[in-house]
Amino acid sequence: MNYGFIKTATAIPDCKVADCLYNSGQIIELLQEANRQEIEIIVFPELCITGYTCGDLFGQPLLLDEAEAALSRIVNATRQTKALAIVGCPLRQDNRLFNTAVVIGNGTIYGIVPKSFLPNYKEFYEKRWFCQADETDKGSITCCNMEVPFGPRLLFTSGKVSLAVELCEDLWVAIPPASYHSLHGANIICLLYTSPS
């Protein structure tokens, strides 16, 4: 009996900067462990497929191609797991790069949420590489050969659960996206977060 609770987890994979194949392998191992523990929702860190500290490597098409290939491996691995997984990945849309959270399960991508607020102070200078969520005017994106919903206001609903996603700095602003998500029915907010140390 679960008494209406949902079993959730956060997972921090061992990560190597710009080694998408290695990182996706670590993520898949954690997905399999989550499946053994009957986790229903598992949240991974921001940019966990590439590593957060890639710097100007984010401008390299090879890294971005490898990131999407690694994401495809992870999506395929979810065919054997029951958990909804949320992973961080840099993704392109029409020559613009976004820091995104990808919501996946059952071998499919349910939606992709771009980061709304990019930090640009101290050691953080994401605006050098990424566009903010409001810089997209399309409601979908082609990723891993799938056309999927894309935007900062996505809600993922199943039964009585309505889930929303935000990334790191989004939580730090005066009125975070989670406030609006909650007003629109979200009862679970998943936050992907990473800070270099």
Set out the residue ranges of the language-model regions.
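Enzyme catalytic cores with a strong preference for nitrogen-chemistry domains
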Residues: 1-195
